[in-house]
Amino acid sequence: MESQAPTLTPADIQRFERDGYLVVREAFPRADALAMQERWWSELAGTHGIRRDDRSTWRQIPGNLKAAKRDPAQAAILTGTVRGVFDDLLGAGSWSRPRDWGVTLVTFPEPGGWELPSRLWHWDNPCEPHLDRTRGLFVVSFIGPVAPRGGGTLILSGSPRLLIKQERRIPADQRRGLDGRTRERFYRSHPWLIALTGLAPSPADRIATFMDGETVVDGVPLRVVELTGEPGDMVFCHPVMVHCRAPNRGPRPRFMRIKQQFLTHEARTLLRGFLA
């Protein structure tokens, strides 16, 4: 049997290894994303009384959309392109079809200026299963259009490489997974990170300081990136990508999904051993 041609180029993989994320436009059909968006609006109306054509009903909802998370229509996300990305980044045969594509994120617009948050920066997975190579992904899917300042998740480009680098220096019997000490060590490892995460007074212009250019920390270039895209676009991130929720100052709600933990079979085995 002939081997499957790679979906990603060597430059794509190099970019992922450097920055910890890769944007893939039109990863699944726009029409399928828009069909899912219609179902989300139906659930918002039926469960929360929020109607698309009546902005007076728009408000933040508690939790996530429950029916949307289970919706069979999401099967359309696993296209040949998406399979190819998984194979190229994780290895063919190393992963299984996900049961779902993660949490359903809806953020309605609110008034005010757009500011870069200083709190709630975090990552969702421990470093341990990924110390020698990437064995999982943090996957973002765009169900609706998300423009700049429109509530798109903020990621810290380069952070997975820095976190893994720091974790490798710690003796195996002293690694603590996702506990508070691990997070605090990362946040306080450089003045730039201390200011980003609100542990020190912020610079006058947080956007310019943290988003307009890279700052090198321990040999790793870091920069805050706002995830924007069109329905059907996806972003494939390293599982220890540092990220943060962003305010929505745009004209429409943010509709995205995030699969926080998409792990290979090997990663699941390693994680069980680490947690035992």
Over which residues does each language-model region extend?
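Non-heme Fe(II)/2-oxoglutarate
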Residues: G46-R52, T81, K165-P171, G180-Y187, ...
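A generic secondary-structure signal for well-formed alpha-helical elements
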Residues: W40-H48, L90-S94, S141, A147, ...
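Non-heme Fe(II)-dependent double-stranded beta-helix
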Residues: E2-R18, R25-H130
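Short, well-ordered beta-to-alpha junction loops that form the rim of enzyme active sites
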Residues: A27, D100-G102, F142, G158, ...
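A short secondary-structure junction signal
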Residues: L116-W121, L131, P148-G158, I164-R168, ...
